[in-house]
Amino acid sequence: MGMQMKNFKKMMTLMALCLSVAITTSGYATTLPDIPEPLKNGTGAIDNNGVIYVGLGTAGTSWYKIDLKKQHKDWERIKSFPGGAREQSVSVFLNDELYVFGGVGKKNSESPLQVYSDVYKYSPVKNTWQKVDTISPVGLTGHTGVKLNETMVLITGGVNEHIFDKYFIDIEAADESEKNKVIYNYFNKPAKDYFFNKIVFIYNAKENTWKNAGELPGAGTAGSSSVMENNFLMLINGELKPGLRTDVIYRAMWDNDKLTWLKNSQLPPSPGEQQQEGLAGAFSGYSHGVLLVGGGANFPGAKQNYTNGKFYSHEGINKKWRDEVYGLVNGHWQYMGKMKQPLGYGVSVSYGDEVFLIGGENAKGKPVSSVTSFTMRDGNLLIK
């Protein structure tokens, strides 16, 4: 998409889990074939029958599925997404249909990149997509979501669509001599000036309604990971502003249609590092009661720069894709070991006690088609 996409990808780059454990590769874990095409900044979900669906992002409008219950597991292409190519959407299964919320993309070849607030759903039985007659209360990009039950999904976080959209409008309108000024002015602001979304929304697919369920107990984030287990919600890290992460993990209990916030926690520093920068685009999921968080990316030193008053906190810092894995064991976060390679911005899907890491972006910023998994087994973290 020319210079506009170049700036968009730069923006996505910037935004954009003590137990004694052993890291091994294991024959116990399920082995899945690579996705038919590399995938980063995509989305995915699993249905109640053990079928995983992934698509969008660098796959364009393509979607694929794989049945985990079949003896011979292969990816199959399903009907293409009708809403246009987009990145950073969120998807969940509700009422046996795949719902896709928001994202960022171009409506046509001439339009600027923009945040979407639309919703689509896919019927596995009919192999058809349908645009849902609703729009989200705010634009949804950099948001995160978790399924609450068969009819409701919780969605929170994400960028401010007006500020985000204006950046790309300004970049497109600027000549070459002005672009660096536009970029600097956009990034050189305190976190509060980006107005990342901190409202928690509940969408009810049966009633096709949205509900305000309150606000996050701290700052809004973008690029956070989220998981739900036994009615406990975990919102993991994310960006406070472009280039600046947080190491905070929000925890809440969902009970009687009400969200009650509990005490926050923090990821520990990586071995050899003085502080935890926090992660955006990390993989996450539960295995045998242990919450595992791995991969993602950050800008080492950005947090200290921001503390020192430098608002363009990641200026001049190379983005670092992470390979560390952390685990929440008996209420305490611990460093568990390393992934096969640094990776972030892929799709996390849990099935039983396996957490599948599908696609992602490698340390060169390129999308990958690999599928790996985390599993806790007999006190060991198994990586397949």
Swiss-Prot record:
Q: Which Pfam families match?
A: NANM
Q: Which GO terms describe its cellular component?
A: periplasmic space
Q: Which residues form the signal peptide?
A: 1-29
Q: What is its main location?
A: periplasm
Q: Where in the cell is it found?
A: Periplasm
- Kelch repeats mapped onto the chain: 51-95, 97-149, 151-184, 185-230, 233-282, 304-353, 355-384
Q: Which domain of life is it from?
A: Bacteria
Q: Where are the transmembrane segments?
A: none
Q: How does it assemble?
A: Homodimer.
Name of the featured protein: N-acetylneuraminate epimerase
